[in-house]
């Protein structure tokens, strides 16, 4: 597969989510995002209101809810998502209750996803994190089908914070096969090089979450 640098840049969700991020670090990150030409930045919920410069440059602003453990009630995640949108976010990456994903409980998944979707209707883009490193392929398929049924926009592999690891090509293939184009697929966690990113796109990813956007794009072929 041949992918241009500019196309890859638009696929990237360039991420800065550490708990210690300062305002000055965020400002430098936004300058970097503009210089790199990425499509989206993903920043802490409390800092969305500081991203006007990125928005003015045409960069989409994403944030997170229920992050990184997913162990808050759905209505709390919904409130987080609503606040993020009010602050200027156009996309929210939500961590599902990973135990429910792991159990393959479609009804409980639907209840959670619908509650959040109703709080932030389309055109806000909702991506739901499955933490694929700790769930079975069967559970991944169940979760993807629930996301489709509930009107989600993306299934996302990982938070990037779980000790079990991040995205794998195999998990992305399972997600893409289940989705058949009905929701986008975001690979995140451990994507560090151009070759990594291309492999995930070839497996079916339509977005790449990474804190390594500069290194990835530096690896683009001439």
From Swiss-Prot:
Main location class: cytoplasm
Subcellular location: Cytoplasm
Entry-linked CDD domains: DeoC
Name of the protein described by the UniProt record: Deoxyribose-phosphate aldolase
InterPro entries, sorted: Aldolase_TIM, DeoC, DeoC/FbaB/LacD_aldolase, DeoC_typeI
Source species, domain of life: Bacteria
Pathway in which the depicted protein is active: Carbohydrate degradation; 2-deoxy-D-ribose 1-phosphate degradation; D-glyceraldehyde 3-phosphate and acetaldehyde from 2-deoxy-alpha-D-ribose 1-phosphate: step 2/2
One GO location term (cellular component): cytoplasm
Entry keyword Cytoplasm: yes
Gene: deoC
SUPFAM superfamilies, A to Z: Aldolase
Keywords: Cytoplasm, Lyase, Schiff base
Family classification: Belongs to the DeoC/FbaB aldolase family. DeoC type 1 subfamily.
Keyword Lyase: yes
Active site per database record: 93 (proton donor/acceptor), 156 (schiff-base intermediate with acetaldehyde), 186 (proton donor/acceptor)
Record's catalysed reaction(s): 2-deoxy-D-ribose 5-phosphate = D-glyceraldehyde 3-phosphate + acetaldehyde
Species of origin: Corynebacterium glutamicum (strain ATCC 13032 / DSM 20300 / JCM 1318 / BCRC 11384 / CCUG 27702 / LMG 3730 / NBRC 12168 / NCIMB 10025 / NRRL B-2784 / 534)
Annotated EC: 4.1.2.4
Function: Catalyzes a reversible aldol reaction between acetaldehyde and D-glyceraldehyde 3-phosphate to generate 2-deoxy-D-ribose 5-phosphate.
SMART domains xref list: DeoC (SM01133)
